[in-house]
Swiss-Prot record:
It comes from Arthroderma benhamiae (strain ATCC MYA-4681 / CBS 112371) (Trichophyton mentagrophytes). GO terms for biological process: proteolysis. InterPro entries: Aspartic_peptidase_A1, Aspartic_peptidase_AS, Aspergillopepsin-like_cat_dom, PEPTIDASE_A1, Peptidase_aspartic_dom_sf. This is Probable aspartic-type endopeptidase ARB_04018. Residues 94-367 form the Peptidase A1 domain. It is an enzyme of class 3 (hydrolase).
Length: 370
């Protein structure tokens, strides 16, 4: 992440803690529940796979593999390591529309972050290219002497000015007031208007997914969800899983902690799990140049499963074949290693699962998608 002094901050949606207070107005819908469908961006540039890994690792303050760290420091490969692709090729460009003031922007609803900031007209013109821009000078009220700043695990970050403005998501409008102490999130403030203090994620493989707020749509999952308690002491949707499976190999006694993060692409798992999974794939190897596990693109990948009590959350092998490295016949895996707990379960895991985020507990429920 570059460090820009001209971005603009607003509310967080779905984490537990934030520095932003979002107060519901009288225009907030009172139906008790609503659904948001993701939108497909029609023209995108897809990132070189190691860059996406870099994003996930730095977001969760994880050590960077030497190759990824070296690339991030020197820029070079990240600057020219992108290719033009069809929109759904890597399942990374599904977003949600939000209106701030009079401007409609694309955002990623993210359970793994406590910050939400947007590109604004205060950025240099070059940095505004290929982005929808918020124009605070038209509808916002600038807070004097108020700034925001966020940093990531690799020492980079972003910063900017603070404005008040109206934020509208799926017809629900809130007025945002920023204060320099922890406050409720946007979701925390609308919970009292919902039938139940829950939201669910039903993300899809190569198709737009859905977020439901205030209810559980039983037509979207199979069987009864299996629940785990959440440890929210660090502001994350974090829990302990009781095992995993790689193909026919069952490891029902290997317990590990993980954050369920809708804003991260990969499954970032303990090294022992990662190595066991790729050991069954002919031609797979840890590619030091690209900083992650790779394999021949024509390889047939085995299923992977995470144990949630007695339920096995199965991830099809095709969901783990994340992307082809440009100019090669080698593909980058959707499972990558981390050496520090907790692990992170991102899009590669979520695209096959129906996940319930329940503030009453708190707890999370898991079931197979219908």
């Amino acid at each position: 992440m570059w460090h820009s002094p001209f971005s603009t901050a607003f509310t967080l949606f779905l984490g537990f803690f934030t520095l932003t207070l979002a107060l519901p107005t009288n225009s907030l819908a009172t139906t008790g529940h609503f659904t948001i469908e993701q939108r497909l961006i029609n023209t995108i540039k897809s990132d070189w796979p190691p860059k996406e890994l870099w994003r996930g690792l730095r977001k969760h303050h994880r050590p960077l593999p030497p190759a990824v760290s070296r690339i991030s420091r020197h820029g070079g490969s990240f600057a020219n390591g992108t290719v033009k692709v069809t929109p759904d090729e890597y399942d990374t460009e599904f977003v949600n529309e939000i209106t701030i003031g009079n401007d409609t922007l694309f955002v990623d609803i993210d359970t793994g972050s406590s910050d939400f900031w947007v590109f604004s007209s205060q950025l240099p013109e070059q940095s505004q290219r290929n982005h929808r821009i918020y124009h605070p000078e038209k509808t916002g009220i600038k807070l004097p002497k108020q700034i925001w700043e966020t940093s990531y695990g690799d020492g980079t970050g972003a910063a900017g000015n603070v404005f008040l403005d109206k934020v509208n998501l799926a017809g629900l409008e809130v007025s945002s007031q920023v204060t320099p102490k922890k406050q409720k999130t946007w979701f925390g403030n609308i919970m009292e208007r919902l039938e139940k203090p829950i939201f669910t994620a039903c993300l899809k493989h190569k198709a737009p997914g859905f977020y439901d707020f205030g209810f559980i749509d039983k037509t979207k999952h199979i069987g009864n969800p299996s629940y785990l308690p959440v440890d929210n002491s660090r502001g994350w949707w974090e829990t302990t899983f009781n095992g995993f499976s790689t193909g026919p190999s069952d490891n029902s006694t290997y317990r590990f902690r993980a954050v369920v993060d809708t804003g991260t692409t990969f499954m970032l798992l303990p090294r022992e799990i990662t190595e066991q999974y790729y050991s069954s794939i002919t031609g797979s190897a840890f590619d030091r140049e690209n900083g992650g596990w790779t394999f021949p693109c024509n390889a047939t990948l085995p299923e992977f499963a995470i144990h949630v009590n007695d339920y096995k959350a199965i991830v099809p092998g095709e969901h783990i074949n994340w992307a082809q490295i440009p100019g090669t016949n080698t593909c980058f895996g959707g499972i990558q290693p981390v050496d520090r707990s907790p692990a992170v379960l991102g899009g590669s895991f979520l695209k096959s699962q129906f996940v319930i985020f329940d503030h009453d507990g708190p707890k999370m429920g898991f079931a197979a998608q219908r």
